[in-house]
Amino acid sequence: MIRPQLRTAGLGRCLLPGLLLLLVPVLWAGAEKLHTQPSCPAVCQPTRCPALPTCALGTTPVFDLCRCCRVCPAAEREVCGGAQGQPCAPGLQCLQPLRPGFPSTCGCPTLGGAVCGSDRRTYPSMCALRAENRAARRLGKVPAVPVQWGNCGDTGTRSAGPLRRNYNFIAAVVEKVAPSVVHVQLWGRLLHGSRLVPVYSGSGFIVSEDGLIITNAHVVRNQQWIEVVLQNGARYEAVVKDIDLKLDLAVIKIESNAELPVLMLGRSSDLRAGEFVVALGSPFSLQNTATAGIVSTKQRGGKELGMKDSDMDYVQIDATINYGNSGGPLVNLDGDVIGVNSLRVTDGISFAIPSDRVRQFLAEYHEHQMKGKAFSNKKYLGLQMLSLTVPLSEELKMHYPDFPDVSSGVYVCKVVEGTAAQSSGLRDHDVIVNINGKPITTTTDVVKALDSDSLSMAVLRGKDNLLLTVIPETIN
């Protein structure tokens, strides 16, 4: 009686491995089907797609794996990919199974950091927050809004990712240069007034530890109190030490017992067209505003711009020079000054005084100091101007439809506030064509006319012909 039972048990032991061997191919075939890529049509025909499905609350249809029809996405821990699987919901990733023979399922990406929600909870990842939000919407609860990367208790900033860390070279230059960039504020008294009011502002940068600052000549002028504000908020009174109206450069000086950050002059002759540059300054009285661009040409000759007596080549850039940015440094990616922001004509066309001329200007100033010579009094109008040429006139007509139909003269780029030019009625975009009965074709003609105590200017403004009288200021 016992022997048949033994035979049956033995038969079972023999049959079990065989059955398992038969089942494994079936399971493997099913898993293979799940991992096999879907068979996509050669041409997508949306008209043959099934009707747009109604998905679970909180999810919207997405394109299928063939990128043709819209289907409901797979939720967390649901099967994804393969011939039968679906694409995962936004924020989820189709994860490979831990063991062979099992399908891929949707889950949170392995990469990513903690995130703080508006419910003041710290979630392990953005994906985890979104998963809980989907569940909250299904239950009619309020979903959390991601408010910051990192834990909710963190007060510091998130560490830079690889792209920001490796390619954020502009920010590195600004951080290096900004402490040496200063805000130059001019104060003056209004007519019949005794109270000092701000009348003009510009920029500059420190070039020596004893407080020498380079800026534009049109930024500083006579009978004004000049205030310099450093990046750390320290304020100093400044005095003009030297000025060159032809170069549009000035040296001013502050007295400070603190150690001042200094910028080094690079060589503008080493610049290359297409090289990245950064223009820093304080437009609209804002500290350390930066604009970036490239060098359009490193030698835009003064004669090309219509300055017949000019032997200086300007650095043309496409970085924007805003109001108040004048006098700030133009730096390369090493943080060396390769120019002084000077002139903006139109969007994408700005000019800087090359650092090689700034170096020459400082050498001449040093020589004057060694010989005990003070610079002589000079006349000042308060204009940023450019000789008008045919190409420049055509460019200006494209930007300003009411620009006068003229191809020669001197174009007024900017009238400095509180100056003789502004008091006379001159405006931005005016064209000066005659002074004291003599035709004006270059900026040099305007500078030569400053020998007169009074200037009678013929000006074109749109379709109007104006006659203005300007009394130049004397810079002491």
Swiss-Prot record:
Coiled-coil segments: none
SUPFAM superfamilies reported for this sequence: Growth factor receptor domain, Kazal-type serine protease inhibitors, PDZ domain-like, Trypsin-like serine proteases
GO process annotations (BP): negative regulation of transforming growth factor beta receptor signaling pathway; positive regulation of apoptotic process; programmed cell death; proteolysis
Kazal-like domain mapped to chain residues: 88-154
Protein name: Serine protease HTRA4
Compartment annotation: Secreted
Keyword Transferase applies: no
Presence of keyword Nucleotide-binding: no
Catalytic residues of the enzyme: H218 (charge relay system), D248 (charge relay system), S326 (charge relay system)
Domain PDZ, first and last residues per copy: 383-474
General function of this protein: Serine protease.
Extent of the signal sequence: 1-31
Superkingdom classification of source: Eukaryota
One cellular component term from this protein's GO annotations in UniProt: extracellular region
Keywords on record: Disulfide bond, Hydrolase, Protease, Secreted, Serine protease, Signal
Similarity remark: Belongs to the peptidase S1C family.
Catalytic EC class: hydrolase
Region of interest called Serine protease, as start-end residue ranges on this chain: 202-362
InterPro entries the UniProt entry points to: Growth_fac_rcpt_cys_sf, IGFBP-like, Kazal_dom, Kazal_dom_sf, PDZ, PDZ_sf, Peptidase_S1_PA, Peptidase_S1C
EC number: 3.4.21.-
Entry's Gene Ontology molecular function annotations: endopeptidase activity; identical protein binding; serine-type endopeptidase activity
